[in-house]
Amino acid sequence: MGLKWTDSREIGEALYDAYPDLDPKTVRFTDMHQWICDLEDFDDDPQASNEKILEAILLVWLDEAE
């Protein structure tokens, strides 16, 4: 079973693992959306995301980066 948009914690952690040298404060949502869809374990409709979901994922990524 793959990652879904509702798995914000797991996706944020996966982004941190995939891009450890990237400062999440500099990331655009359009780029982050693509990176999430490109994650090997991601298995959800790319069009099902929204700003609230991306913000939740970004907050986890920021927390991991600190």
From Swiss-Prot:
Entries under Gene3D superfamilies matching the protein: IscX-like
Biological process per Gene Ontology, one example term: iron-sulfur cluster assembly
One GO molecular-function entry: ferrous iron binding
Origin: domain of life: Bacteria
GO CC, one annotated term: cytosol
Membrane spanning residue stretches: none
Family statement drawn from the similarity comment of this UniProt entry: Belongs to the IscX family.
Subunit structure comment from the entry: Monomer.
Function of the molecule: May function as iron donor in the assembly of iron-sulfur clusters.
Protein name, as recorded: Protein IscX
Lineage start: Bacteria, Pseudomonadati, Pseudomonadota, Gammaproteobacteria, Enterobacterales
